[in-house]
Swiss-Prot record:
Name the record gives this protein: Gene 67 protein
Amino acid sequence: MRPSLYDQIVAILDRHDSCCGFERDDAAEELHALVIELYGPPF
């Protein structure tokens, strides 16, 4: 079963979270900024 678009976005945003041991990811950084711009700082 393929992951939903939501699941894929969450996985990318998780890559943005440096506390989880991932290296900096430019795509995740940009997606995170877009989500904040659209939905606000809680994300």
